[in-house]
UniProtKB/Swiss-Prot annotation:
<dbReference type="GO" id="GO:0052150">
    <property type="term" value="P:symbiont-mediated perturbation of host apoptosis"/>
</dbReference>
<comment type="similarity">
    <text>Belongs to the pneumovirus non-structural protein 2 family.</text>
</comment>
<feature type="short sequence motif" description="DLNP; interaction with MAP1B">
    <location>
        <begin position="121"/>
        <end position="124"/>
    </location>
</feature>
<dbReference type="InterPro" id="IPR004336">
    <property type="entry name" value="RSV_NS2"/>
</dbReference>
<dbReference type="GO" id="GO:0033650">
    <property type="term" value="C:host cell mitochondrion"/>
</dbReference>
<dbReference type="GO" id="GO:0039557">
    <property type="term" value="P:symbiont-mediated suppression of host cytoplasmic pattern recognition receptor signaling pathway via inhibition of IRF7 activity"/>
</dbReference>
<dbReference type="GO" id="GO:0039564">
    <property type="term" value="P:symbiont-mediated suppression of host JAK-STAT cascade via inhibition of STAT2 activity"/>
</dbReference>
<keyword id="KW-1045">Host mitochondrion</keyword>
<keyword id="KW-1092">Inhibition of host IRF3 by virus</keyword>
<keyword id="KW-1088">Inhibition of host RIG-I by virus</keyword>
<keyword id="KW-1114">Inhibition of host interferon signaling pathway by virus</keyword>
<keyword id="KW-1223">Inhibition of host TBK1 by virus</keyword>
<comment type="function">
    <text>Plays a major role in antagonizing the type I IFN-mediated antiviral response. Acts cooperatively with NS1 to repress activation and nuclear translocation of host IFN-regulatory factor IRF3. Interacts with the host cytoplasmic sensor of viral nucleic acids RIGI and prevents the interaction with its downstream partner MAVS. Together with NS2, participates in the proteasomal degradation of host STAT2, IRF3, IRF7, TBK1 and RIGI through a NS-degradasome involving CUL2 and Elongin-C. The degradasome requires an intact mitochondrial MAVS. Induces host SOCS1 expression.</text>
</comment>
<keyword id="KW-1090">Inhibition of host innate immune response by virus</keyword>
<dbReference type="GO" id="GO:0039502">
    <property type="term" value="P:symbiont-mediated suppression of host type I interferon-mediated signaling pathway"/>
</dbReference>
<keyword id="KW-0922">Interferon antiviral system evasion</keyword>
<keyword id="KW-1093">Inhibition of host IRF7 by virus</keyword>
Length: 124
């Protein structure tokens, strides 16, 4: 009879909750990855150099966000995410303040799934 069997082997941790992350959780996470200090700096630079009004600045913000989203996830997932964003209004919208004709993006308005985010709270 074999007596070399030892019950002291470490057990592997079993993960029982294997549900996929919800799309809203993924989008929230992606938004936090995309919108960084560098992203806001680029938007503010565009606002100053091109003297954008609020509508133009918001459009510039969203175009840059979508380009970064597309680059990050690829075209197939991008289509799914933008359909979801459009349907549920989860696109991050910028908050601008006006400095005597020059706009500055100071943060992101809250959406259904994300809190208000100020540029000071963002990852560098």
């Amino acid at each position: 009879m074999d007596t070399t069997h030892n019950d002291n082997t470490p057990q592997r941790l079993m993960i029982t909750d294997m549900r996929p992350l919800s799309l809203e959780t993924i989008i929230t996470s992606l938004t936090r990855d995309i919108i960084t200090h560098k992203f806001i700096y680029l938007i503010n630079h565009e606002c100053i150099v091109r003297k954008l009004d609020e509508r133009q600045a918001t459009f510039t913000f969203l175009v840059n966000y979508e380009m970064k989203l597309l680059h990050k996830v690829g075209s197939t997932k991008y289509k799914k995410y933008t359909e979801y964003n459009t349907k549920y209004g989860t696109f991050p919208m910028p908050i601008f303040i006006n400095h005597d004709g020059f706009l500055e993006c100071i943060g992101i308005k809250p959406t259904k799934h994300t809190p208000i985010i100020y540029k000071y709270d963002l990852n560098p």
